[in-house]
Amino acid sequence: IDRSYYYSSIHEELDKMSRMVGELLDFSMLDNQMSSMEMSRVNVSEMIEYLLLRYDAMFRKNEIKVEQEIEKNCFAYGNRMYLERAVNNYLMNAFQHTEQGKRIRITLKKEKKQIRMEVYNDGERIKEEQMEHIWDSFYTTSQKKKPVTSENEVRNIGLGLFVVRKIVDKHKGSCGAQNMENGVLFWLQLPEIRDLGK
C-alpha cells in the first residue's frame, strides 16, 4: 500500500472541504450584508478601469493579452464594493480559463438605458449540458487552466458565478453567458443612471 498516496489524497480532500466551508461562510456573510447594503451613484467605467489596472501585472506575468473597450461615464445606482466583487469574479473566471498567449477582451457600453459589460476569453467552450448549471452554488466545469492563488484573492470552488448572479439580481440587473466560436463570453447588464454632472 502506498501510504503517501493516500495521505496526499486525504490532505487534498480535507483542504478542499476547508475551502468550501470557508467559501460558504463567506457567502452567508455576503448574503446577510447585501440585505442592508448602502447604494449610491457608481461610475462603472472608472471601477472597471481600476480593476484592470490592479490585475495588469498578473495578466502580463501569465502572458495573457488583454483588450479593453470601456465607454466613459457609464453610471449605475448600486454598491461599489459588491459591484467590484461581481466584476472581479468575471475577470478571475476568465483568467483561470485562459492559456498563455491567448486573449481576454473586456467591453463596457451604454445600450438601451442599460450598462452592458462583456468579458470574453479565448479557450474551451462550455458544454451545453453544463451551461444552465454554471450559476448554481458549488458547481464547477472542472476546466480551469490555473490554480487560484492569493495573488488574485479569489477562492473558487463553484461560488464565483453564483455570487455574480446574486449581486446583479440585488442591483435589478441581469447576467448570462454564451459560447462563441473560439471561447466563452460572460455578460452583465445594470440599469443606467444619467451622469448628473452633465
Each language-model region and where it sits:
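Short alpha-helical segment of the dimerization/phosphotransfer core of two-component systems
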Residues: E12-M17
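Conserved catalytic submotifs in the C-terminal HATPase_c
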Residues: E38-R41, R60, K65-F75
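Short helix-loop "hinge" at the ATP-lid/N-box region of the Bergerat-fold HATPase_c
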Residues: A94-F95
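Short conserved segment of the HATPase_c
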Residues: I126-Y139, K146-T149
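Short alpha-helical Gxxx[C/S/T] motif in the catalytic ATP-binding
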Residues: G160, V164
